[in-house]
């Protein structure tokens, strides 16, 4: 319905980005979808409803943990190629680790910066389908 209306209104979708959530289990679901299931359901939905002319889809983290959001993005990109670029537009999933490390204290600024850089680096790898959970532990060991 969205893209039908955009086409009817003569919107050039080649100049747009879609910013959705991923297909996730409900908050109260006892049976949680795994990483591959989330990736498959999300890509399937996008394939059915988003025209190939849309250049990119940038995901919200939608309340996921930092690492889950990264793992899901990675799994989607690993299933590619896709007609659109799949990337991230995370707020909390990028900022929360940095804010936790910083704690509002001047002496923790560098720790907050390192935490932010680490999350951005993990998501950059996921954007290319190159993320692995082991990368999280390697960074902690440094």
Per-region residue spans from a language model:
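Active-site capping/gating regions of soluble enzymes
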Residues: 1-142
């Amino acid at each position: 319905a969205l893209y039908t209306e955009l086409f009817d209104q003569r919107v050039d979708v080649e100049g747009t980005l879609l910013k959705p959530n991923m297909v996730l289990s409900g908050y109260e679901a006892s049976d949680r979808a795994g990483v591959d299931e989330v990736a498959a359901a999300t890509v399937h939905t996008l394939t059915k409803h988003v025209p190939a002319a849309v250049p990119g889809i940038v995901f919200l983290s939608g309340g996921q943990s930092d690492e889950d959001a990264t793992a899901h993005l990675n799994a989607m990109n690993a299933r590619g190629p896709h007609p659109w670029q799949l990337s991230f537009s995370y707020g909390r999933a990028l900022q929360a680790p940095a804010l936790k490390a910083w704690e509002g204290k001047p002496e923790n600024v560098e720790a907050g910066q390192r935490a932010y850089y680490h999350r951005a680096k993990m998501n950059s790898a996921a954007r290319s389908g190159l993320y692995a959970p082991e990368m999280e532990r390697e960074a902690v060991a440094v």
